[in-house]
Amino acid sequence: MADLTPLYRETRPYRRCSRCVLDTVGPHPIDFDDAGVCNYCHASDYAVAKWAIPPEDQKIRFEQAIGAIKASGAGRAYDCVLGLSGGVDSSYVAYLAMKNGLRPLIVHLDNSWNSELAVKNIENIINRTGFEYFNYVIDWEEFKDMQLAYLRASVIDIEVVTDQAIFAILHIKAHELGIKYILFGDNPKSERTMPSGWNYQKNDLANMRAIHRRYGRKKLRSYPLMGLYDLDWYRKVAGISYVSLLHYIDVPIPEMKATLEREFGWRDYLWKHCESVFTQFYQGYILPKKFGVDKRKAHITDEVLSGVITRDEAIRRLEEPYYTDEQLREDYDFVTRKFGLTPQEFEEIMALPPVPHSDFPQDRKGFIWALRIKLGRIRAGFCKFFGQAAASCSALSSGTA
């Protein structure tokens, strides 16, 4: 049953950007200028010009950030919270924290989908750094019910279920312990570009509750929830700020990986965000088959625009299959069994037509967020959302700390 024949049917004539690797396949709007350059390249250029830290300022801003974090934690057991998935970005932030004398509480959300490799990478990092580690094990039956609700709803961003729980736990632990800084591993070299319609706002509780109310089958008793208004409270009242250390350095991704391999015995994954078996399957099977989305295009586009690889190299990488036949069969069987679905039941869900998140109720702020994306006034994506939040809410990000 693990057949990658796409259900998604693209109606537009095929065209690929002349500068990056984004194309017309998928639910996203895309436009090209006279030179064949897409609107996402122009949006990236705008974001870099407006928000990127000039190379000559990076060192001082990095040192300011480290100093402010250390000062805030004086007399406390920890000076920051760091969410660790075992992926390259959060792992490298752990390395930077170790090298610069920070005392983070490492927080990990165990949603029962960790790959064996991710578990080993996290274990190696904790052992090498000596950092304190808090592993939040989410109730699997509730979490499974949430994921199945999103699958049955046929919305695109099933990862909302994981991502919003991670945000919630990070803020809850920081506030509980009086910690004022959360370290994020968002990386402008690989997470700046995300086409409109490929994801959704991670903290829209109205949307989440509506989806679960219609398609969920269990009452949520312990699943951690944090909406947009909670997020505002943590920033503005509790005084918790985000720091993205990877915005203050200019280290190529291959060099980051080499450092992690040397320092921690870290090992790389199949593709970006494949620390989770479900995310690996979601990106490699659900998204391309049902929605026409190959997220590698966005991640690799950022590497092209950052000068990490050439466009020709990027095209060659995209020509590589996401999965081998054996890997796909293994993940397909594992995921369907874990969800308690037969292959036929799962494929019936896959065959349902895609439904936009906007077909369900939205928080007012979530609606405005989505509207701005459609108007092209902000760049979609996890990284950009939190990059702008940091710029407006953290003195560090404005360079005034």
Feature names for model-found ranges:
Residues 92-93:
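Hydrophobic positions on the alpha1 helix immediately C-terminal to the Walker A/P-loop
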